[in-house]
Amino acid sequence: PGDEFLTIAPYFPEYQVFVESAGGTLTAVPADPEDFQIDFAAFAAALSPRVKGVILNSPNNPTGVVYSEQTIRRLAQLLTEKSAAYGHPIWLISDEPYREIVYQQEPLPWVPSYYANTLVCYSYSKSLSLPGQRIGYVLVPPQAEEAELVYAAVCGAGRALGYVCAPSLFQLVAAACAGQTADMAVYRRNRDLLLDALREMGYTCAQPEGAFYLFPRTPEPDARAFCQRARKYDLVLVPG
């Protein structure tokens, strides 16, 4: 209770619910509005002694941005410096349900290789194209500070929330499909189709390098009102 967490905006809105339900506060640091990459000047300014954790989502929901190795290295260096200055670890929670849904050639950086105090959250539901079927894991790297205690805390948190075991059927599915993915070419085709159409109609939209979202700029200041009007055309949009 009372701890602060940072994340990059725009972000998956349930992050705020997760943090606040545990008595913490979530501060969103706006990304660079042109490419949605981390604005390191703003991020460093927000990284106060109250911050105990950072939530990172790459590939990102909702922008589709992917953070490069250079970005992860820079973030790791900053968190290492601030952890030493403040006298406590700043945990990096790397939320990676879209890890396999990428449209670039180079592999995604494995975050624990750059920053020891990283917790990796993964879900099979996206890579297998089974959204809604919640099965995955939280990885606590052995090199993390007090790794055994943190591992026990993660297990205890799941039990406290009522999640003792994943559904038995999907435990078998995950085991049988290890190393497999759905056809990623379908996602790329849909991305290109929608992105090209939006740009032809005059919308500004950064090209997603991962996940299955588009985050176009609304043609008017009130994004919420724009999304409400879109419902008349059976379009479900989320303002950001």
What kind of feature is each model-predicted range?
Residues 1-240:
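PLP-dependent class I/II
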